[in-house]
Amino acid sequence: MDSGKSSNEDMKRAIRWEVFIPAYLVVAVAAIVGIVNKDMLTKASNMFFFWSLDSFGWLYQISIMASFVLVAFVTCFSKIGSMRIGGKDAKPKYGFWTWFAMALTGGIATGIVTWGVNEPVIYFGNVWGELNTLGIEPGTTNAAIFAMARTYYNWTFIPYAIYAMCGLLVAYIYYHKRGSLTVTATLKPLFGDKITTPVASAVIDTLSMLALTIGLATGLTMCITLTVTGLKSAYGIAESLPLFIGIGVAIIFAFTFSTYVGLDKGLKIIGSLNAWFYY
């Protein structure tokens, strides 16, 4: 009883309410607005997205290419690349294919299934008008080359360079510097202790949680939509809101359960099954 109580108290202390509550409120408000007035949420989201793209698009590109260069060259062709996460005597907890399955299904699984076919067709047909800025005629050989190149840029080395960079930073700080599993901890070597003040760390980690939550929500929505349309195409099951909600609840339950039982019994098995079905 005492150990259980102590464990519960530790769990309660582990929840950073100054991070959880603001992020939860933002997501909850967005969800309520989406239910009450979907068009308003869509318009506001698009305005923010295009504003950020116009204002910080250059920074996105620099950050992306910096991640690719650092991961591909610095970590692979320098002494840093030979460093073993966890110490020189550390052993891998899982085999290569298990890690591969978890990385694939946790990284681009839903996105690549959805956009792996759609995106080349979109660029080939100039649906988004990108070919107009390059002087390429839609439906031509050059358009096909551009479409495939753009799709590979979006879904292969570039995104995984970003994931690898973030993962390596967090892992290095946690295992070698004994820091916390937070984005704030990865910034401490650059900005010093001032970045770890309660206010600064709360703001940074709240924004990080929002980015993760919104990203997961996007992937979840794509997954549900893909499943619903697949059921309609294969079995003639009509699309409906109850079906959409039911699939969403099932996916959330599976994810929550896999998180609760731990990496060994949860994500490892689900990721391996996903990868097996995928291939």
Where are these regions (language model features)?
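Membrane-water interface regions at transmembrane-helix termini and the short interhelical loops
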Residues: 5-13, 38-53, 73-91, 146-154, ...
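N-terminal alpha-helical transmembrane segments of multi-pass membrane transport
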Residues: 1-140
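Membrane-interface loop-to-helix entry segments
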Residues: 22, 53-56, 63-66, 204-212, ...
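Generic hydrophobic alpha-helical membrane-segment signal
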Residues: 97-99, 104, 144-147, 155, ...
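Helix-loop-helix module between adjacent transmembrane segments
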Residues: 10-14, 18-21, 25-35, 68-73, ...
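Membrane-interface helix-loop-helix junctions at boundaries between adjacent transmembrane segments
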Residues: 121-157, 236-243, 257-279
